[in-house]
Amino acid sequence: MGEVVTGEGYAVGTLDDLGEGPGFRKVRAPLGVTAFGVNAVVIPPGIESGRHFHDEQEELYFVHQGEVEFVFGDGEQRHRLGPGGIARVDPRTVRQIRNVGDDDAIYVCVGGKDGYVGRDGRVPEGEENRARPIAS
């Protein structure tokens, strides 16, 4: 296991830097995140999370690896997602995540309270914000 590297205004690391084995990998504190909650979760095959909901926190899930099934509400609504899959869930919606694949599933969950900042990104003075080949 390595370690998260921090600098002035940034932090970088890997999932392995945040822990080993199945379960929650807390991202917020090690990377110094203050604006929202974020965790990475590793679920072994055939394992499901507990059902839960939140009072205020909307959540966005991004499936990085494996195949998961999201179970919503009373269990009648089920949706399978593989790598690159995204799900957004209202705070009060009961949800459960199940690993229905043959390998470990890894997903990232980001949560926050209502309120949109809007587009506030800016380009440093004298630079262009465009995709271009990497300069060697």
Labelled PLM ranges:
Residues 1-35, 50, 118-136:
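A short, N-terminal "cap"/entry segment at the start of jelly-roll beta-barrel domains
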Residues 24, 39-55:
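Conserved short histidine dyad/triad with adjacent acidic residue
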Residues 28-30, 49-55, 72, 79-80, ...:
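Short histidine-centered beta-strand/loop micro-motifs
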Residues 34-36, 44-48, 67-69, 113-116:
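Short, charged/polar surface micro-motifs in flexible loops or helix N-caps
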Residues 35-37, 57, 104-105:
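A structure-centric signal for secondary-structure junctions around beta-strands
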Residues 54-83, 93:
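A short beta-strand-loop-beta hairpin characteristic of the jelly-roll/cupin
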Residues 69, 83, 91-117:
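Ligand-binding loop in jelly-roll beta-barrel domains
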